[in-house]
């Protein structure tokens, strides 16, 4: 069992490094050497923290976490704009339809929403958001809508990472919560998906909130007994 766990850790580090190289490759195409530097440091940092977690004094864990958490939002937004892709698939369709409705008052893709009814609620929420933006910024256009939606999506992901830290803190304590939070803050798939204000980003926040509240209820034995 110990060998299996060690093998899984090695595979995790390798996959993490490969993914980080791909991401950094899109950001630092001007220098091949720069692509390899961040994965090495990040992998070494994760290995060091997980193997030497006892060096983390509990009184410093909160300070370290707040520093990492604050930097996480900056990196989320920076990654999202540096790795920005053209609007496509369902997210692009909802973004374009919401912008069209707010800017022109028309909706050409009615057949699409008749077929994919799950995107109707997402469209309503996006239209409402863009109407608020249009009210605050009368000259706002499609690019403004897209950029603001990216920032809001990053905030959703950032809050979800914060909830993961709170969940770990509730279950394991400050020290392990700090490690779990830093690992969540370094989870690159979250960075790659943060630019899409689609069902998954607010859904992840709602899921983590529900999980946190469920743990709070479970630990509150008095309320738990009343509930059942």
Question: Which positions does each model-derived feature cover?
Answer:
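Transmembrane-helix motifs of polytopic, lipid-linked glycan transferases
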Residues: 151-171, 209
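Start-transfer (signal-anchor) and selected internal transmembrane alpha helices
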Residues: 1-79
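Short hydrophobic/aromatic helix or loop-helix immediately within or flanking a transmembrane segment
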Residues: 97, 112-144, 154-155
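Hydrophobic core segments of transmembrane alpha-helices in multi-pass, intramembrane catalytic enzymes
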Residues: 38-43, 94-96, 122, 157-161, ...
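Helix-to-loop transition at the C-terminal end of transmembrane segments
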Residues: 27-28, 75-95
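Short acidic/glycine- and proline-prone juxtamembrane loop motifs at membrane-interface regions
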Residues: 189-203
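Short helix- or helix-capping micro-motifs
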Residues: 180-188
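Membrane-interface transmembrane helices that cradle and orient dolichyl/undecaprenyl
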Residues: 210-227
């Amino acid at each position: 069992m110990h060998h299996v766990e060690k093998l899984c850790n090695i595979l995790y580090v390798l996959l993490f490094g490969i993914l980080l190289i791909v991401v950094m490759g899109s950001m630092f195409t001007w220098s091949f050497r720069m692509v390899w530097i961040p994965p090495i440091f990040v992998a070494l940092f994760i290995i060091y923290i997980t193997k030497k977690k006892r060096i983390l004094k509990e009184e410093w864990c909160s300070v370290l976490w707040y520093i990492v958490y604050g930097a996480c939002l900056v990196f989320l937004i920076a990654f999202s704009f540096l790795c920005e892709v053209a609007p496509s698939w369902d997210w692009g369709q909802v973004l374009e339809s919401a912008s069209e409705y707010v800017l022109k008052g028309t909706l050409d893709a009615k057949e699409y929403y008749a077929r994919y009814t799950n995107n109707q609620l997402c469209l309503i929420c996006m239209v409402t958001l863009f109407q608020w933006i249009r009210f605050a910024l009368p000259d706002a256009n499609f690019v403004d809508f897209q950029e603001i939606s990216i920032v809001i999506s990053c905030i959703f992901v950032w809050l979800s990472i914060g909830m993961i830290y709170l969940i770990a803190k509730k279950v394991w304590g400050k020290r392990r919560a700090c490690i779990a939070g830093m690992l969540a803050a370094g989870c690159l798939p979250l960075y790659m998906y943060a630019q899409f204000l689609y069902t998954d980003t607010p859904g992840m926040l709602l899921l983590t909130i529900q999980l946190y509240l469920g743990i709070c209820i479970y630990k509150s034995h008095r309320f738990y007994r009343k509930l059942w």
